[in-house]
Amino acid sequence: MKFYTACALKGNKVLVRGYNNGVRFTDTVTYKPSLYMRTDTPSKYKTLTGVNVGRIKFENLYEAREFLDQYRELEDCPIYGNTDFITQYIMETYASEVEYDLSKIKVAYLDLECETEGGFPNLDAPNERINLVTIRISGVNYVITMKPLNLPDCRVVLVASEKELIKKIFDILRQCDADILTGWNIKLFDMPYIMGRAKLFYEEKEIQAWMPFGFMKMRITNI
């Protein structure tokens, strides 16, 4: 049984993490995507409205992106096909229904605590220090803190500074080989705040190196 847990694009490659017969794998794949354009000749490929289209197979992702840049603004040359190349790769590589072995997928639950001297911490100006982080994964509770704590059911990780605390978060996630990181409001507060504080202590390239694929992408969500 083979299944993926994460896919990402980096330059001209597709990066994939998953499990094959219960064993973790991380692959770097050279993917050759396809797109489609109208044709006057009969074709086995058709649009949802029955228009004949021809398949264009690219040698790599760069070629496909250049093609899109060249033709996407031309009204009389519509491009068909999935231009989300990650989705296209997944649909081709895992064409049948993916059977996941949930016992292999490692889920990490994270929560952080901040000081509140200046009120509730602000994502736009993360000026309140993170003083404690908890991570639960594979039945183990980690507590990363700058103050000694007696918690018999936890692994207390004592650090000397917030800078060290932030680095330790990613050390634990990497050592435990987490597939999924979750928690209460983790997408809208916890992780953005951690990254905001991390940038006060570390260069961007250092932070990128902590990630499973060696890079990260952040996006702004307005609510």
What is each stretch, according to the model?
Residues 1-223:
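The two-metal-ion catalytic cores of nucleic-acid processing enzymes
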